[in-house]
Amino acid sequence: MRLIIVSGRSGSGKSTALDVLEDSGFYCIDNLPAGLLPQLAENALINTELLQPKVAVSIDARNLPSHLMRFPELLEEARARHIQCDVLYLDADEEVLLKRFSETRRRHPLTNANRSLAEAIRVESDLLGPIADLADLKIDTTNLNLYQLRDSIKLRLLNQPEPGTAFLVESFGFKRGMPVDADLVFDVRCLPNPYWKPELREHSGLDQPVIDYLAAQPDVEDMYNDISSYLLKWLPRFAASNRAYVTIAIGCTGGHHRSVYITERLGQQLQQTLKNVQVRHRDL
């Protein structure tokens, strides 16, 4: 049986995550009281007619604070029943969360006459801290639209052909911010930039003219070889430490040329030696 626990601050995309999982065959339960997590796991194992072998639940800040504080203990009880449990934590910048609530005119569950929306968001962050600390996978939805979030969840949680650590090699542009869910970040902004070549500007690192240009630059080759050597040596150690997810982020200025080229090459090489390697270009 597989159990996915979805959590995160309000407005970060939990409902979308549950919709994706339900569309993928999961039996979904919204706003499960955290204290019922071990009981749910036990019932799912005993009564397979009632529940599917794939279950997803959301746990949010409407739970009793005492139950949220006990989340590490409750999760351990569920895992002790030999259930594959993945904790997905969604989040976004506070400014973006404020904007989303303003646009949708929804009420935050923790606001009241004495607590503003901004204060409610900060309180919620503290309440969900025990869950965030144990997340197997964190997804920052700050720069993701609805469709990108759906694709990201499918890529990271559902498209794993084999068990083991799931690796994501992701390109990004620093001008749109670093991905906060990255485990390893490599900055390639020091490399020659195709953007300043008028004939290359409108192309991306996926296009042959840019590939040919960057492949001919000695510094690009040196940078690629150094990053590749580091990852080939150390990523197996991450896998051996039972990490469920590892994200490697490669950043350049705009996320269109250098980072895309390096990410594509790294992804292709890592796929030859590691299982479950995915490639994503955040800003293309």
Swiss-Prot record:
SUPFAM superfamilies: P-loop containing nucleoside triphosphate hydrolases (SSF52540). Disulfide bonds: none annotated. ATP binds at G8, R9, S10, G11, S12, G13, K14, S15. InterPro entries: P-loop_NTPase, RapZ-like, RapZ-like_N, RapZ_C. It comes from the Bacteria. Displays ATPase and GTPase activities. Belongs to the RapZ-like family. PANTHER family: RNASE ADAPTER PROTEIN RAPZ. This is Nucleotide-binding protein Pput_0988. It comes from Pseudomonas putida (strain ATCC 700007 / DSM 6899 / JCM 31910 / BCRC 17059 / LMG 24140 / F1).
